[in-house]
Structure formats: C-alpha cells, structure tokens
Regions:
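Short aromatic/hydrophobic "clamp" motif used to bind/position activated sugar donors
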Residues: 69
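Conserved donor NDP-sugar-binding/catalytic core segment of glycosyltransferases
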Residues: 80-109
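Short, well-formed alpha-helical segments that are part of the catalytic scaffolds
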Residues: 4-19
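Acidic donor-binding/catalytic loop of UDP-sugar-dependent glycosyltransferases
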Residues: 35, 74-88, 159
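Hydrophobic helical membrane-anchoring modules
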Residues: 159-217
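Glycine-rich, basic loop-to-helix element that forms the pyrophosphate-binding segment
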Residues: 48-64
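Acidic helix N-cap motif at the loop->helix transition within catalytic regions
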Residues: 8-12, 34-42
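A conserved acidic beta->alpha catalytic loop
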Residues: 16, 29-37, 76
Length: 217
C-alpha cells in the first residue's frame, strides 16, 4: 500500500486487511509528515521510499515474500472475501487482474459512468490502481514492475501485463473513493481524467501530465 499523509484513512483501511488471514501487509510511505507511519505500524510492516506511487509500489514488492502481489490504495474499499477471489483467479491461470469498481458515493449518473468504465476495462484489460491490481510475483518481475513514471503508471503497467499472459477483471466490486471528484468538481474531474488519459495514450509525457493532476489529500 503506497501512502503519503493519509492519517485519516490508513487505520480503517489496514484494519480490514489485517482481518483477513494469510496476508503480508506492507505499507510504503513516501515522506508523510502526519501520523500515517505511526498508525500504519500497528497493523503492517512499514518501509519508506522516495515519493511517487510507482517507486513506492516497486519498493514494497521488493520486500514482499508472497507468490501474489496485491497493490491496494488506501481509499479503496475491498469486497468481502477479496483475498480468496484473488487467489482463485491466479489458480485459474490468470497472471493478474483487478476488481470491478463503483464509487463510494453512488448516484444513478455516476453508477452509469462506472458501469461504462467497467465495460471498457473488461474489453481492454487496462486497470487503474483504484481497482486493487493483483499480479503473480514472478510475472511482476518478468515485466519489470511498475514503470517509475509520475503519472498513469498503472496504465503503463497494464499494457505490459496483458502481453505477459491472461488477465481478468473480477466481477466483485471494490468501492472507489469519490474524494478526488468531490474536491475538484465531479464533471470537471471526469473531463480532465478523460483528456489526460487520451493524451497519455497519444504519447504525451507523463511528467508533463502529472503537473496537471491535483493531489487530493
């Protein structure tokens, strides 16, 4: 779990994960100045790294000893029995995948948006990190881990992963935080996300795009 100044959410998120047996919990802090590290240490192994989600997730992967790596964002709420669903998918031969999502503040309009996004994800196998990406550890290292770019590392990683083998979007639904949309304005944020993703797919530098993407903490 990559974190930076997440004292409001870290404890609740880790309490859920700690309640599931058989998980090795690793929190990678990118330089928090609040109580994030102290709270996380009650439930997980905490390491530090330079800031940057890709850098932090790669650092956590190097510390992990399991056969499956599972990258969970602090503001993603996982469905019941999520670990067993991940294990079952890998046992079926998938090299990785992620969960379906909906927002944690649903409305008919935003349910439609997430339904369309789930459909896109199922077709193209491009997973955002808010979907709690999982991957076989050996496959993760074969493809070189997350590209250490400042933005859309999850999309770039998905491209590499789908070339390595079969991936799956699970039907089980994880709740994605609406906080980014609430802070920036829902429609404005939706349009910005679409523009930034389209620009990235056209080859615009992720370093340039990262400057346009606001931190919501």
């Amino acid at each position: 779990m990559p974190v930076l100044n997440e004292e409001k959410l870290i404890e609740g998120s880790l309490q859920v994960l700690a309640g599931w047996p058989g998980l090795e919990l690793i929190v990678v802090d990118g330089g928090s100045v609040d109580r994030t590290i102290r709270l996380a240490a009650r439930y997980a192994k905490v390491i530090t790294s330079p800031p940057g989600r890709a850098v932090q997730m790669n650092a956590g992967a190097r510390e992990a000893g399991g056969e499956i790596l599972w990258f969970v964002h602090v503001d993603t709420t996982l469905p019941p029995d999520a670990p067993n669903q991940v294990r079952a998918a890998v046992a079926e031969g998938f090299v990785g995948g992620a969960f379906s999502t909906r927002f944690d503040e649903p409305t008919p309009f935003w349910d439609l948006i997430t339904c369309l996004d789930n459909h896109r994800t199922r077709i193209f196998h491009v997973y955002f990190g808010s979907r709690a990406i999982f991957v076989r550890a050996d496959t993760f290292w074969e493809v070189g881990g997350f590209p250490e770019i400042p933005f859309l590392e999850d999309v770039a990683f998905s491209r590499k992963l789908r070339r390595a083998g079969r991936t799956v979007m699970l039907d089980a639904v994880a709740l994605e935080s609406f906080r980014r949309f609430r802070k920036s304005g829902p429609i404005r944020q939706l349009l910005l996300d679409m523009i930034l993703l389209g620009a990235f797919e056209l080859g615009v530098s992720p370093w340039f795009l990262a400057r346009l993407y606001k931190d919501v903490r």
